[in-house]
Amino acid sequence: MKDHSKKTIIQKHSYGVLLFTGNEKDRKYLIVQNRDSESFIYFFLAWNIERWNEHYLLKVVKGFSRDELNRLLYYPFDLIYTDLYVNHVKGTYQRQYNRAKFNYTYFHSRADWVKLCQNVPTTEIKWGFSKGRIENGEHPYNCAIRELQEEVGIVENDIVLHPTMSPIHYRNEKLLFRTFVNVCLFPAECPYQLPVIYQQFANTIRCMSVSNEILHARWVSLEESFFLLPTNLYRLLYEFHITNRS
């Protein structure tokens, strides 16, 4: 008989870009704002939602933005799903659709859940570094560059690899035990000026995204990042800054 007492943790990897520019005294880092919060995506992808208790439901929903909570409460499922999954990949689309629809339908079948969530305090959508899932056989650096191009509009010619930096690994225990790997890059014209693509946008830009996953991108100092990034990402950035001085 198999021993089911221990939970098996499946590692999932995402690859991203820690993009920076400027000199040592005035270094800026590019962070992006997700269109959808991690909690909102997790709600529609989670298995066994029918086993959730009220405490866990509230823990997930508190990570929504106010707009996302309103969408869950008042929008029809197909409208939410079309907005959430803009790239319909054959094979995975139907599986994700069925799971997401089950979660939505089950939530609305529970009048106590709906009432409980109507006045839940929500958060702002988090800032972070551009990241995405690696494809089969794809090199991590190629994945990072592809994600940066798809989500923010930067092409490979605009950036070069940091000469001494290896990928940074950090864990997010709250999101499917996923391991994020940030690949360090900087603009080809660094440290003297920003790439041409940003010169007309000043500090905050509207992303030229083809996937609609990202709302905004912004160059921030280490100090500014403290107010925008989650604690684990801020720590990652701080450790990178103090251990990789030019």
Please identify what each model-predicted range represents.
Residues 15-20:
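Short beta-strand scaffold segments in enzyme catalytic cores
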